[in-house]
């Protein structure tokens, strides 16, 4: 497990790891427990996410709607979802934005993406400075990753309203409603891997976990 690069200077950033989802596809495949707590090399999946994000931000916390005691070993604040009639990842995003609101910018990631770029924050901040957009999302292999993004924390009222009235309660559709820019991140390489891999590769299925272990072993070589 390798740490990220030093955080970019000139902007205060709060980071949030959103540990949502039910891990249902993983459990249906015979793997019990939370997908982000599965072992990946010498540490759980989420520990790799922490190691890559923490050096890029000023403060970092974990968000979840479940039992927060699961995260006690990681030494980070854990914030439970705001109680709302709606559910899903947008509530997690709202919780993170509200918790980070003393800071101007929030960097988010899922808890099951262990190979995040070590220069993710600097690339997203650069795009935000160039465009002035309130939402910057990561993109790789022609696919936008709505959970991985840089958000202006003044979006809280917009998101609260969206959750009240919107029919499409997804992060992507909220971002599309507000307007967003993307940063295209190239596929990554490891010397012992025959093929490149997506730095936003996420773990949903048992086969994904096996692939993640293969990538991790190659990165540690």
UniProtKB/Swiss-Prot annotation:
InterPro entries: MobA-like_NTP_Trfase (IPR025877), Molybde_CF_guanTrfase (IPR013482), Nucleotide-diphossugar_trans (IPR029044). The keyword Protease does not apply. The keyword Secreted does not apply. GO terms for biological process: bis(molybdopterin guanine dinucleotide)molybdenum biosynthetic process. Mg(2+) binds at residue 112. Signal peptide: none annotated. It is an enzyme of class 2 (transferase). It is found in: Cytoplasm. Transfers a GMP moiety from GTP to Mo-molybdopterin (Mo-MPT) cofactor (Moco or molybdenum cofactor) to form Mo-molybdopterin guanine dinucleotide (Mo-MGD) cofactor. The N-terminal domain determines nucleotide recognition and specific binding, while the C-terminal domain determines the specific binding to the target protein. Monomer. This is Molybdenum cofactor guanylyltransferase. The lineage of its organism: Bacteria, Pseudomonadati, Pseudomonadota, Alphaproteobacteria, Hyphomicrobiales.
């Amino acid at each position: 497990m390798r740490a990220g690069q030093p955080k970019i200077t000139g902007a205060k950033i709060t980071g949030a790891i959103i540990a949502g989802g039910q891990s249902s596809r993983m459990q249906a495949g015979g793997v019990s427990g939370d997908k982000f707590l599965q072992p990946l090399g010498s540490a759980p999946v989420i520990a790799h996410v922490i190691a890559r994000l923490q050096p890029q931000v000023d403060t970092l916390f974990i968000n979840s709607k479940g039992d927060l005691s699961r995260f006690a070993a990681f030494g980070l604040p854990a914030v439970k979802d705001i109680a709302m009639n709606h559910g899903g990842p947008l509530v997690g995003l709202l919780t993170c934005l509200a918790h980070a609101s003393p800071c101007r910018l929030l960097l988010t990631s899922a808890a099951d993406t262990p190979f995040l770029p070590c220069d993710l924050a600097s690339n997203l901040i650069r795009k935000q400075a160039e465009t002035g957009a309130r939402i910057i999302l990561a993109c790789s292999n022609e696919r936008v990753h709505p959970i991985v993004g840089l958000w202006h924390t003044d979006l809280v009222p917009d998101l609260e309203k969206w959750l009240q009235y919107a029919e499409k309660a997804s992060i992507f559709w909220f971002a599309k409603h507000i307007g967003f820019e993307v940063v295209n991140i190239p596929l990554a390489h490891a010397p012992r891997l025959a093929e490149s891999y997506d730095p936003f590769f996420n773990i949903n299925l048992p086969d994904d976990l096996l692939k993640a272990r293969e990538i991790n072993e190659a990165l540690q070589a």
